[in-house]
């Protein structure tokens, strides 16, 4: 439990209405001199933002997330199947929770999942992954001389920009945060 005056941006709290992330917090003094804490809260399972007022000194339950390592197995009926490497249970994760992370997934990739009450709320990919190039544009002679770039389609279906010397079948290292080519492996 934390006191309302200890709320800070980025903190997760649990209320009777659900799980929320604090996105803004301020102390407000009312007309009669009574102060309260005004917080903007984003629902953890959607993009809905609500405003809540808390009395000064009110106790609020802070949500304690658990980080788990999950190994991606395959996709099944619009859900992604993972294996929890801690207890070897299978976990299904929806496309909504995956967001754009699924663009880089291939079997065997280990991700970090933020879990609360045995429910996965977010997935974080490794910052760097090694993926195979399955298709590239043909670089013209002028592109090779000037050191330009070309498009490459990776084995997971994502398209990125690569240097002209990258060919089909090459394994390349990419930054999953920026979707940029790092190096040929």
From Swiss-Prot:
Pfam families: EFP, EFP_N, Elong-fact-P_C. One of its GO terms (cellular component) is cytoplasm. Signal peptide: none annotated. InterPro entries: Elong-fact-P_C, NA-bd_OB-fold, Rib_uL2_dom2, Transl_elong_fac_P/YeiP, Transl_elong_KOW-like, Transl_elong_P/YeiP_cen, Transl_elong_P/YeiP_CS, Transl_elongation_fac_P. GO terms for biological process: peptide biosynthetic process. It comes from the Bacteria. Pathway: Protein biosynthesis; polypeptide chain elongation. Gene3D superfamilies: 2.30.30.30, Nucleic acid-binding proteins. GO terms for molecular function: translation elongation factor activity. It is found in: Cytoplasm. Keywords: Cytoplasm, Elongation factor, Protein biosynthesis. Involved in peptide bond synthesis. Stimulates efficient translation and peptide-bond synthesis on native or reconstituted 70S ribosomes in vitro. Probably functions indirectly by altering the affinity of the ribosome for aminoacyl-tRNA, thus increasing their reactivity as acceptors for peptidyl transferase. Belongs to the elongation factor P family. NCBIfam families: PRK12426.1. PANTHER family: ELONGATION FACTOR P, ELONGATION FACTOR P (EF-P) FAMILY PROTEIN. This is Elongation factor P 1. It comes from Chlamydia caviae (strain ATCC VR-813 / DSM 19441 / 03DC25 / GPIC). The gene is efp1.
């Amino acid at each position: 439990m934390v006191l309302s005056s200890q709320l800070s941006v980025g903190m997760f709290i649990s209320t009777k209405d659900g799980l929320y992330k604090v996105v803004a917090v301020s102390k407000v003094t009312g007309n009669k001199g009574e102060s309260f804490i005004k917080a903007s809260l984003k629902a953890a399972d959607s993009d809905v933002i609500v405003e809540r007022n808390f009395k000064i000194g009110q106790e609020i339950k802070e949500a304690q997330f658990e980080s788990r390592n999950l190994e991606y197995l395959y996709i099944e009926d619009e859900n992604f199947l993972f294996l929890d490497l801690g207890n070897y249970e299978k976990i299904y994760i929806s496309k909504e929770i995956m967001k754009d992370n699924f663009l880089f997934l291939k079997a065997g990739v280990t991700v970090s999942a933020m879990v609360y009450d045995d429910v996965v709320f977010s997935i974080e990919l490794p910052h760097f992954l090694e993926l195979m190039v399955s298709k590239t544009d043909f670089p013209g002679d002028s592109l090779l001389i000037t050191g330009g770039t070309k498009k490459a389609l990776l084995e997971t279906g994502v398209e990125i920009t690569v240097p002209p010397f990258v060919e089909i079948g090459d394994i390349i290292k990419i930054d999953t945060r920026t979707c940029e080519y790092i190096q040929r492996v």
